[in-house]
Amino acid sequence: MKIKRILLSLAVVFGLTSFGSVANAACGNITIANMNWASANFMAEVDKIILEEGYGCSVELVPGATMPTFTSMQEKGEPDVAPEFWANAAIVALNKAVDEGKMHSINKAPITGLGEGWWVLPHTLKKHPELTTAEAILARPDLFPHPEDPSKGGFHICPPGWNCELSNRNHFRAWDMEAKGWAIVETGSAAGLDGSIAKAAERGENWFGYYLSLIHISEPTRPLE
């Protein structure tokens, strides 16, 4: 018997230990989304061990990414488990799915409340303290040369499959960044995004783009003209 229970965290879920009476039932086969970033890979592997060793389940890790996994879980009920999910990527649709009983959040996670946005490195802000708003950054593409075309500013975005890839592409268009001298840097993967930051930090180079926690660049709430 396969446990047809869709488990989805509203932030990040670690450890599937809240099965209640289901834990004593025959477990059967379970699929777990193995998302394309490191912390999600780790959590998927830990959940696999817990389910196999603790509950006798047959567990398969399947490739996943935020939006494709959410869509598949919502529409097809597969995979069964997403041990890590960024809720703000699809918060309206997620809340609706939870309200309708299509998905369920189980327990609080050890990693919650992470911010995300546009960032620069500390050494950049120290040298250019005026760069604290999106407008100030976008006026200086010369400070952030694109790795493939130094005549343009490089704006690093999320890997394919992350909802923030779409939102950052939309921001790129909304801010008319191409006309301001910018071009998107395709990071390709979570490792590629991380590596671009690490490389810039090691070399003392400037870096601008999307990430989880560095030096936050505020974006005004006024409507764009």
Which residues does each PLM region occupy?
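Paired acidic/hydrophobic, glycine-rich loop segments that form the ligand-binding mouth/hinge
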Residues: 80-85, 205-211
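C-terminal segment of classical bacterial N-terminal signal peptides
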Residues: 14-23
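Short helix-initiation/N-cap motifs at beta->coil->alpha
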Residues: 37-38, 58-75, 183-195
